[in-house]
Every structure is written in C-alpha cells, then in structure tokens.
Curated annotation (Swiss-Prot):
This is Dihydroorotate dehydrogenase (quinone). One of its GO terms (biological process) is 'de novo' UMP biosynthetic process. It is found in: Cell membrane. Transmembrane segments: none annotated. Substrate binds at residues 65, 110-114, 171, 176, 245-246. PROSITE patterns: DHODEHASE_1. It comes from Pseudomonas syringae pv. tomato (strain ATCC BAA-871 / DC3000).
Amino acid sequence: MYNLARQLLFKLSPETSHDLSLDLIGAGGRLGLNGLLGKSAAKLPVSVMGLEFPNPVGLAAGLDKNGAAIDGFAQLGFGFVEIGTVTPRPQPGNPKPRIFRLPNAEAIINRMGFNNLGVDNLVSRVEAAKYRGILGINIGKNFDTPVERAVDDYLICLDKAYAHASYVTVNVSSPNTPGLRSLQFGDSLKQLLEALSLRQQELTQRHGKRVPLAIKIAPDMTDEETVLVAAALIESGMDAVIATNTTLSRQGVEGLPHGDEAGGLSGAPVREKSTHIVKVLAGELAGRMPIIAAGGITEGRHAAEKIAAGASLVQIYSGFIYKGPALIRQSVDAIAAMPRTAS
C-alpha cells in the first residue's frame, strides 16, 4: 500500500509531498487509524539514558519539526519519536526549493535551514498530544543569532522544552545554518556543554526530574576530531550522542540529477560514513555514554549493523520516506535477530 502512496506523493514536489504526508499522518493519528499500519511493530524493550524504550527504533528529528503529528508517528510503531529542530523564535528557513530527492541513490538533499514555528508553538502541540511514550525534542539556534551567542538560544529552548521532553537533543551539526558546525569543536563546544550541564542541573531541581541531554554530531569529522568530541562529552556529563546528521559529501550521488545541490545529504550514501563515526565513538566512550545511530538505514539489516557498531538505539528518516512504515518493523526484527552477547 505504501508503494502506491509513494508513487503518488513522488509526483509532487518534495516539500509539498512532505507537508501532505505530515498532514495525513497527523490526521491518521487523531483518528487512531495509523495503528492499522503499525500494529505489528515488535516489542523489544531496551533501557537507555535511564528511559525505558518499547523498541530501539525511533523517528529522527526533521520530519516533524513542529510536533504536528506526534500521535500519528507513535502509532506507526516507533519506539520513540524525536521532533524539531526548533528554535526560540519562528523562522521561515531558506528559500524554496530546498528539498531534493535522489531516488536512484535512496537519498535526499535538504537545505531547509531550521524552518519552524518556534519553541512555544511546539510546546503547545506537545501538550495537546495524547502520546505518553518517549519523546525527544531537538533544539537549535535562530539563523540570525550570532554563533558567539548561540548558547543563549539553546538555553532558551532547553528551559521551555525541558518539562515536556523525555530527552532533549542539542543540534550543533546541521550544515544549513551558517557557523553552526563550529560549535562541535574546541572551546566553543566546551563552553556550550558546560552551560547546558549547569542549566540541566538547575532544571532538575526546579522540575524534580532529570531530563537527559543528547548531542547530535556531523558525519564529516575526522577520527581525531571525533575522539576529541567524545572526550568533551564525557567531561561535561552529557547523557548521549546522536551520530549522525547529514553530510556535505557528495560521494555516491555524483552525476545524479540534483546531486550537486547545496545542503545536507541523507539516506543510503551517508550510511558507511555515519556507521564509521559510531564505531569510533564506541571505542572512545567504552560504554560510558550511549550512542543513538542515524544515517542511511534503508533496510532492517542496516539498523542491526548500527547496533553491532556500538549503538544502543537507531533512528530513521530518509529510509522512512523511501520504504514507509514497514521499515520500522523490519529494523526491530533485524535487531531482535542479532546474536546475544555475553554480559
């Protein structure tokens, strides 16, 4: 059924089909119809960040930026749902067109630029949702906020999202906000992590609960840079790392229509690059911090490969666009079929 729907949706522009799909998933959630597609999603409980996940396969941020279809996505069988990226103030993002499909490569290039309705709007939608499962809220900075003041934007979003999130993801790796990726390195990263950790402690006291913080990183780092990031995350006491965001590389899409468009590349071509980052992180973190793997999962076995590389959870986005809800069950089943390691 999804193959037919995809054929129809792919006749529309990528952003139009994205918006229509979000509307349909949201409507299905309100009517309770999406469970007909996701009812067979397996249970494979896992405890990560002190949270109990019904299965380790989640929706990556970016598909539902404003929390418009939380209930709908949850009913499809995801073990957790991450919404955003959201910024303190609403912003329109980059000019259209800004999403491009590369179906021959099972890939997408986007340069959305954190288009969203603002954190206050997102919080109101979370409050209106019926979903009580694991919800991540992904936060970023406004386009016109100078990088040297980015910490302020993250703290504003953290303050407002904290009480409504199971965990909060700090996005310092989108390639579509100028200067953002510089926050992954050196003193900029250290200062950001210190500020977030301190505010997390304050909010824990204020709300009587500790909400874990995850940092989402890029796939375009060297091994040496990845090792330094891992050390900074451990030192600051962050709770998890998400590996990875989209890539600036065009390996695997050379010569394809739209392959040279500006923006972040996601889908199958980023898989090996992202999985390599997971492996490097796993070696450095040595179990001290969980890894959430995202990037290039288009078949169930790819999810299992991420777990084998050292991840505790996985997320899908582009693969969901190309394969539909069936990919959720396939990914859970593939992980469940993995050989058990002695503890």
